[in-house]
Amino acid sequence: MVLNLKLGSVLSKGFRKVNVDKPRQIAFEVLTEVMQNGAYSNLLLPQKLSVSGLDTRDKAFATELLYGSIRALGRNDFIARQYSDRNWSDVDPGIVNVIRLGAYQLFDMRVPNHAAVDATVNLARTVLGESKASFVNALMRKLSAKSL
């Protein structure tokens, strides 16, 4: 297996190249800290962004994605529960957080559906692994067919 150590890029025989953009990965990392460890997003996000090397536009995207996902958490969890073929309380917390970010992109941001699904699945592949990314892909496709 050949590893390219750039953020989110993995090259391996038989697998396609996966690129996860830094803003989504930072939003995932902060959301995970908030949901699992009770971290304060308003303290952790600026800290992560200050050392990220992102430009102003990407910082703004990460900020809106994170804070918006937290604001819409109840609604988006409710919708995801309706479309999931698994009991939502049994779903891996990492998957739940990836879906929260993806659902916010679908329902509340100006991200085209296909791009939101693709970026969310790539994020899942990178941070959770291929097997969990399959579930994320299936659920994101169901959610992308839903309109609010």
Residue spans for each PLM region:
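Class I Rossmann-like S-adenosyl-L-methionine
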Residues: 2-148
